Regions:
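Alpha/beta-hydrolase-fold enzymes
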Residues: 2-60, 64, 191-192, 209-328
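Conserved acidic catalytic loop of the alpha/beta-hydrolase fold
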Residues: 166-168, 178-195, 207-211
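Gly/Ala-rich beta-loop-alpha elbow adjacent to hydrolase catalytic centers
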Residues: 198-206
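Active-site nucleophile elbow and catalytic-triad environment of alpha/beta-hydrolase enzymes
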Residues: 338-357
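Short beta-strand/loop motif that positions the catalytic acidic residue
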Residues: 360-361, 367-369, 373
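Conserved alpha/beta-hydrolase "acid-adjacent" motif
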Residues: 374-380
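Catalytic histidine-centered segment of alpha/beta-hydrolase-like enzymes
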Residues: 401-417
Length: 463
């Protein structure tokens, strides 16, 4: 979970329980509403200076005015939840239509299934894949490229987390324990022959959920879990994000970044970590890069470089769309993962039950890290192997991807070319191994054969 570098609201002397950031959210909503007329004026001016019937639209001055108005409108608008925009995929050289539908619902999460509408069933085995998206500020559509990479060879499901400001207070709170309950419920919905991919923040709750299910000999445990860039043990190579959590402490986050949802949102008066504060943290981590990107957008609009401008818009339409997090979930995650390091210390509990990764015996484990990850340092995800001591060595693998940062672990060209094929190979190998060994789903130990997992011809290092 990216905590960001938000400096917090000004401290209020006295009662530390006061949510001192609450006025910021209400002022943010008021300022957004106050800017509506200015946004409308800027958009009208942009259209005027883009109109082919206006002679000024062909001049550098006219193009500059239109570009400046567009930048103002984009900088002050509220970015809504993006669409999935996945209508088809290529399977065996054939273009197959894809239909996204919700197959499971709870107040804070929907499970989306990307159904491929085959005319004839594929001959190749299509393992079932559950992608657990991070609940860390951005919408799950940020993983659009991740979904697209796996659709040709897998039956893909993804957790679609709900913006907390859209959930009425009457639905009750949502914390890390609820998150784990949701994951277990989803795995029960999908059945035992499922593979789970946890992208960043969900690595801890996914590992916890599988640990609890194994301890109960649950027949619906997944065949494998893939943990990608997750903060399993943030004591290893701590990043600036990790250091911030330890330095500030839980009370600071409770009093400085938690706010109440203002009227007229459906979640009015719910305690949340607001999306706009999270975005402040995201942007501040690479401020110069974002300023330069918007400068280039202005120049591209003036030059008429539509392709470059469109790529910028598509990226920032996704990047600037953020969601609020339930305060209970955020604070419990900060405390459990970043402050107390409860999972690697053997102190994590779920509704009073001890979370013990050593209970995992049947579920294969694949961890993936990025060489230049500045959010989850190298070694933090690999630490899962030292916790899951009872998984057979031939059912474990680790991959350190060179030359990628945090987002490159689950998106981008290197992910598509080097990481996704390795995951697909691992998933397919574990599926075949599981079926060949006729692994009982009632918890009996299996006799899985040694399977060499590779991707693009490159062998994976055994953990």
């Amino acid at each position: 979970m990216a905590i960001g570098e938000f400096g917090g609201a000004p401290a209020v002397p006295g009662d530390n329980r006061v949510l001192v950031s609450t006025p910021l959210y209400w002022l943010y909503e008021m300022s957004h509403a106050a800017l509506n007329p200015s946004r409308a004026w800027a958009d009208a001016t942009r259209l005027l200076f883009r109109n082919p019937g206006n002679p000024w639209s062909y001049t550098t001055l006219g193009k500059s005015v239109a570009a400046a108005c567009e930048l103002f409108e984009r900088s002050t608008r509220r970015y809504t939840r993006p669409e999935w925009r996945i209508s088809s995929t290529l399977v065996g050289g054939e273009r197959i239509p894809v239909r996204a539908s919700t197959v499971w619902q709870r107040p804070f999460c929907n499970l989306v299934y990307f159904e491929r509408l085959f005319e004839h069933p594929p001959k190749r085995l299509q393992p079932k894949l559950l992608i657990v998206a991070p609940m860390s500020g951005h919408y799950p559509t940020l993983l659009r490229g991740t979904v697209e990479a796996f659709l040709p060879n897998h039956d893909v499901y993804i957790t679609d987390w709900i913006d907390a400001r859209m959930v009425p207070v009457s639905e009750g709170p949502f914390d890390l324990d609820d998150y784990i309950d949701y994951l277990i419920s989803i795995l029960h919905k999908l059945g035992g022959e499922t593979h789970v991919i946890a992208v960043c923040q969900p690595s801890v709750p996914v590992l916890a959920a599988v640990s609890l299910m194994e301890a109960e000999q649950d027949p619906c445990v997944p065949i494998s879990m893939v943990l990608m860039g997750g903060p399993i043990d943030t004591r290893i190579n701590p990043t600036a994000v990790n250091a911030l959590a330890e330095q500030r402490g839980l009370d600071w986050f409770r009093t400085h970044v938690i706010s109440k949802v203002p009227f007229p949102n459906p979640g009015f008066m719910r305690d949340v970590y607001p999306g706009f504060l999270q975005l402040n943290g995201f942007v501040s981590m690479n401020l110069e890069r974002h300023i330069e990107a918007h400068k280039q957008l202005f120049l591209n609009l003036v030059r008429g470089d539509g392709d470059s401008a469109q790529k910028h818009k598509e990226f920032y339409d996704e990047y600037l769309a953020v969601m609020d997090l339930a305060a209970e979930f955020y604070l419990q995650t900060v405390d459990t993962v970043f402050v107390r390091h409860a999972l690697p210390m053997g102190q994590m509990t779920h509704r009073g039950r001890h979370v013990d990764p050593s209970a995992i015996e049947r579920v294969a484990l694949f961890t993936i890290e990025g060489e230049h990850d500045d959010i989850s340092g190298v070694g933090q995800t690999e630490a899962a192997h030292r916790l899951c001591v009872n998984i057979p060595s031939d059912r474990q693998a680790h991959w350190l991807q060179p030359d990628v940062g945090h987002y490159g672990v689950f998106n981008g060209s290197r992910f598509r070319a080097e990481i996704a094929p390795r995951i697909s190979d691992f998933v397919l190998s574990m599926t075949l191994s599981d079926r060949a060994a006729r692994r009982p789903r009632n918890g009996a130990k299996n006799g899985a054969k040694n399977v060499r997992v590779s991707g693009n011809g490159a062998a994976l290092r055994s953990a």
